[in-house]
Amino acid sequence: MPRVKGGTVTRKRRKKVLKLAKGYFGSKHTLYKVANQQVMKSGNYAFRDRRQKKRDFRKLWITRINAAARMNGLSYSRLMHGLKLSGIEVNRKMLADLAVNDLTAFNQLADAAKAQLNK
């Protein structure tokens, strides 16, 4: 039985890895072994950071809401509790956007939360 070298399959696999490694620095975009290691590491980073991004944005939104809430004399937690009591269902992303781009609308929401907390 003759030996099968598998040249086209191997070349295709290596070409695919080197294509993914395009733009990497130094030998990481030319040498297959190093490129393969870096592509696998990059995939791990991408997987991890897709989840991390959600946490980072939530932290950013909370920080922005807290800053705007404190300008209205409320803490973040008191503002959120007041909004929940008054039945206003606005998510953190929308609240943070209001805090940055439309402060008057945010102030109205904060006043509604304050009124509900003072009842």
From Swiss-Prot:
Record keywords: Ribonucleoprotein, Ribosomal protein, RNA-binding, rRNA-binding
InterPro entries linked to this entry: Ribosomal_bL20 (IPR005813), RIBOSOMAL_L20_CS (IPR049946), Ribosomal_protein_bL20_C (IPR035566)
SUPFAM superfamilies, sorted: Ribosomal protein L20
Any one GO molecular function term: rRNA binding
PROSITE patterns according to UniProt: RIBOSOMAL_L20 (PS00937)
A GO CC annotation given for this chain: cytosolic large ribosomal subunit
Superkingdom in the source lineage: Bacteria
GO biological process: ribosomal large subunit assembly; translation
Pfam families: Ribosomal_L20
Function: Binds directly to 23S ribosomal RNA and is necessary for the in vitro assembly process of the 50S ribosomal subunit. It is not involved in the protein synthesizing functions of that subunit.
Subunit structure: Part of the 50S ribosomal subunit.
Family: Belongs to the bacterial ribosomal protein bL20 family.
Protein's recorded name: Large ribosomal subunit protein bL20
Originating organism: Bacillus subtilis (strain 168)
